[in-house]
């Protein structure tokens, strides 16, 4: 994986073309980058989700206002970007738009209206990437699961508390958000891309234990995989972070085609052990220390591999 931030460092650009070009410079294969699909939805008047740049400091720091609107409620958050001069694409949400039950209810209404008005899939960028990359890369599509979609609007800590404080409401929200997710999975299936990855890192990184993961997050994977399994020549994998050892049995059982990243810094299982346990059922990817690749010698990199 070459991150779009690395492409920006090398080329001054961060789009999928820049990532692909850096792969070509290194002689590696593009597998995952900033590519996605969407679904057109003509929301009724008064409903919108928007991001606006509201302030730019001389030092390069940019403040972005995040606004979710319904006719009865407006929810605002704030994102800061550019606070690290040497890595200007790093951003941090410093205020989340969803702040409590009333906001959740308004967002539920927003999502229901989105579903009612969902129309055709949009994948023009993916189609172009597939054509440009040819046999030199895999134009894989990133998909957002329901757990992530809700948590990134509420913030991890508060969202985990909401699972306990308002379980019925969160269950209802997750069900609606899974229907939104399924629309995007269908868009991937309709696109010329062969591979998609479901970004479940918010759920695995939450370290909430197998029982809670199975209850709140696993259905995202199951529902997405059901859609992909129906399509010929399509593959779905999982992007994970954190300690996933205890989650792997249920993740493998869903039938996903690959699992990454088995990170060495915060993970709790090596690629070798995962391959020994599950390598005959799923493709295992990752587990390479990126600091060695970035700052080590050629010999260090060989030893790490």
Where are these regions (language model features)?
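Active-site loop segments of alpha/beta catalytic cores
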Residues: 1-14, 102-305
């Amino acid at each position: 994986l070459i991150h779009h931030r690395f492409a920006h460092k090398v080329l001054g650009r961060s789009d999928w073309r820049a990532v692909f070009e850096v792969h070509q410079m290194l002689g590696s294969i593009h597998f995952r980058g900033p590519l996605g699909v969407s679904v057109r939805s003509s929301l009724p008047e008064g409903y919108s989700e928007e991001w606006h740049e509201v302030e730019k400091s001389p030092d390069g720091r940019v403040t972005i206002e995040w606004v979710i609107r319904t006719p009865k409620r407006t929810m605002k958050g704030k994102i800061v970007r550019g606070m690290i001069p040497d890595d200007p694409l790093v951003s941090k949400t410093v205020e989340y738009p969803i702040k409590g039950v009333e906001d959740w209810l308004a967002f539920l209404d927003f999502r229901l209206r989105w579903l009612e008005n969902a129309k055709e899939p949009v994948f023009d960028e993916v189609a172009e990437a597939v054509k440009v990359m040819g046999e030199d890369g895999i134009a894989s599509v990133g998909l957002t699961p329901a757990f992530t979609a809700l948590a990134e609007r509420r913030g991890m800590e508060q969202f985990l508390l909401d699972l306990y404080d308002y379980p019925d409401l969160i269950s209802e929200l997750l069900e609606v958000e899974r229907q939104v997710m399924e629309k995007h999975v269908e868009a991937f299936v309709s696109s010329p891309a062969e591979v998609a990855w479901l970004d479940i890192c918010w759920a695995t990184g939450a370290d909430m234990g197998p029982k809670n993961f199975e209850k709140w997050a696993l259905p995202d994977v199951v529902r997405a995989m059901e859609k992909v399994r129906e399509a010929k020549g399509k593959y779905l994998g999982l992007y994970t972070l954190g300690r996933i050892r205890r989650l792997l049995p249920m993740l493998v059982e869903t039938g996903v085609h690959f699992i990454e990243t088995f990170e060495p810094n915060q993970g709790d299982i090596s690629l070798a052990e995962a391959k020994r346990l599950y390598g005959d059922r799923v493709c295992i990817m990752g587990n390479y220390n990126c600091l060695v690749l970035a700052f080590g010698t050629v010999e260090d990199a060989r030893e790490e591999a």
